[in-house]
């Protein structure tokens, strides 16, 4: 995929997130993203003929630790698309953006269902005779 196509994918992704694509450097194959309150990162895109993968980084000391999840994902097996990488970065930054963690929402829904169940009574306990 050429760099302009990658930039188009990034723009489309930004339209559904708080992030803005603030710079796209074709010569460096680098895209810079920013969202309030001061959350920034950049993506280095692999060259077409190269087997390299995407690389994400932040020059902000506050943001860098949150990128570990995305960096681990990128370095895991298999080729990743820019869309997949950006989604993982967004998930990593949710706490910094003041958004609930996507996994926490699913867990809370599941917990709520469990809490609504009535405990079943009159079950004999194991090892206790019913005489």
From Swiss-Prot:
The keyword rRNA processing appears for this protein = no
Give the protein's function: Promotes megakaryocyte differentiation by enhancing ERK and JNK signaling as well as up-regulating RUNX1 and FLI1 expression. Represses NF-kappa-B transcriptional activity by inhibiting phosphorylation of RELA at 'Ser- 536'. May be involved in early neuronal development.
Keywords of the record, alphabetical order, are: Cytoplasm, Developmental protein, Phosphoprotein
One GO CC term, this protein: cytoplasm
**From start to end residue, where is composition biased (Acidic residues)?**
107-120
Region annotated Disordered sits at 107-131
Q: What is this protein called?
A: Maturin
Source organism, top-level taxon: Eukaryota
